[in-house]
Structure formats: structure tokens, C-alpha cells
Amino acid sequence: MTDRLDRGELLRLAAGAAAVGAAPTAVRHLFSKGGGFPQSHPRWRFVFVNHALTNPFFVPAKNGSHDAASLLGVDVKWAGSASSDVGQMVKAMRHAIAAEVDGIAVSIVDPTAFNSATRLALARGIPVLSYNADGGKQNGRLAYVGQDNYESGLELGARVVRLCSSGEVCLFIATPGQENIQPRVDGALDAIRDSGKRIRIHVVASGVHVGHERKKIEATYLANKNLRGLFAVDAGSTAGVAEVMRKYRLQKRGVCAGGYDLLPVTLRAIHDRHLDFTIDQQPYLQGFLPVLQMFLYRYSARLVAPADTNTGLNFVTRENVGRYLTTRSRFEGSSTSDRYPVR
């Protein structure tokens, strides 16, 4: 049956297999049945420019990029900043351009800082995609791969309204204004305001380092023990909320809590009833799909253009957290091992 699949079908199978956890070896077997795809090609070099290189959130994204590189016969390198330093990121992007790489994926966390480098790359024939963050509507990037952050913020706000019908709530953000997380705050604030509920929300900057985020969240709670909810819009802040909720047993005091992403401390807190939910944006796909799209752009002589791709929004709650805890794999960054098929 596989022998009759055309190349487009094989590519869709590859992306789908990555999404459900198929190993690169299994996906490569699909390609081997498709008439020799891919045929011999240069070993193209792709660079991911990132704002949080050491953040555990990006472990599955890096895994996805390297899996796609192994599958397609290309090279991938990650560069940028560990502390959301936009200057370092732009410098890394310009270095990649000077090195004449074959494609750049960049998390556009600033509305204007990357515009010039993007124009330069495109002028030199280097495709530029954004992933995880898509700030700056004037940026000329070819496509965005990631979650719709404003829409996910609306969903977050709706969940806050459902859990906390009134009272004071804190919403923690690592770096206010940064384009991968600020739109989530904006969406949440709009949803809460539009609900008409008597919820007073405080937006609190928690910082870029996970340990510091927890300390800031703890200090904020201790300064206002009447808070009805603790929520966050980034992985580190959500983990910090989880630790504070656990330490002070705040669920038993009627405090609601939730946030983003699938760090182990967050998932365990949901299982243990210290957090109500977290939102998954599938970081593995945010690494895998940009490589696939840049490859196809090169392989097709620029006939297959990169396309905007929403990597989705999934609420993880007590009802479905079990499979995330029992199935540890590199696809969610909880293990270095392949684990497939996931049943």
C-alpha cells in the first residue's frame, strides 16, 4: 500500500508521525518507499535563533529539529541567547547570514529588532521562518510555525473566569513585552474583561531564570495571601506557580492555578491536584516543521513555499495528565529515548 503513496502523501504521513511520536527511523522507512525521496541533494545547513537556549521548554523543540535533520540529511545548529537578549539574537542571526547558511528559523520576540536582518537574509536568498514567537507584523519572514499566542491567551482567560468567578488574581510573565508571551497576557486580559466578572488581575514580571521566577511568585503570594488565583503564561513561571501551590497547599485554601507547557514539575502538580491545568503548544513540532519546510523550499527550487502552521492548543488537566506522566519520551522532552507507538 505504501508503494502507491505520492510524495505529498508521504510528507503528510511524516509530519503526522512526528506529531504522534513515530521515531525518525520509522518515518524514514516511509520515504524509502516513495520512489527514492529524497534524492541526492546538498547537505543544507539550517540555523535556529532562539531566545532561551537553556530553558527546558525547548528540549523537545531541539529534538524535533534534529530528528527532521536526520530524516532529511541536513544539518541544524541552535544559536542565540539564554536570557532573551535581543541584541545577542540579532548578532547570531547576522552571523548565520554571513556564514551563508541555507535557512534560518528565528523566534521573533521583538516587534522590530529582527526586521533588518530578515530583509538582509531574504535579499541573499536565505529563507527565514519564525517559530514559537511571531512578533512584528512588518517582519518579512516567510511563515510562522507555532501556537497562536493571542488566541491561546483568550482560552487561558476563559479558563480563569471559569475557575475564579471573582477576587484578585495574579498573572505571571517572565519578560513583559516579549512577543512569544505578551500576546497571551493580552488575550487573557481581554477575555477576563469581556466576561464582566469581578476579577481584579495583577500582571507580575517574574524574570527569565526559573529559580528566580519561583522566588518572585512566592514573594508575591506572601505579600497578598488573599489571592484567589495564580496563573502564568510561560513554562518557568508555571513551574514556579506549581511549586508555590504545593509548598503552601493553596488548593486546600481555594486558590486556583494554571499555566503553560509540560515541564515535569508542572505535570506532577496537576496529577497531585496542586494545579488545575496547563496548556500544551507541542514544542516538538516547533522544531521539526521549520526544518521540513526549509528543506522543501530548497529541495523544490523554491516552488514549495513555507506555510503558516498552528501547532495547536491542548489543555492538560487531571483527566488526561496520566499519559504524559507514564509515557516519557523525547517528543515531550521528558526522556532521551524514542517511545513509539504511543497508545
Positions of PLM-derived features:
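Hydrophobic alpha-helical
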Residues: 106-122, 188, 206-269
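Hinge/cleft segment of the Venus flytrap/periplasmic-binding protein
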Residues: 31-42, 180, 191-192, 288-343
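Exported/periplasmic ABC-transporter solute-binding proteins
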Residues: 228-229, 235, 242-312, 316-323
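N-terminal secretory signal peptides and thylakoid transit peptides that target proteins
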Residues: 1-18
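Hinge/beta->alpha junction and helix N-cap segments in small-molecule ligand-binding domains
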Residues: 49-62, 78-89, 110, 133, ...
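Short, hydrophobic alpha-helical segments
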Residues: 97, 160-165, 221, 290, ...
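Signal peptide-proximal N-terminal region
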Residues: 63-80, 194-196
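Flexible loop/hinge segments that line or gate small-molecule binding clefts
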Residues: 112-151, 162, 168, 263-271, ...
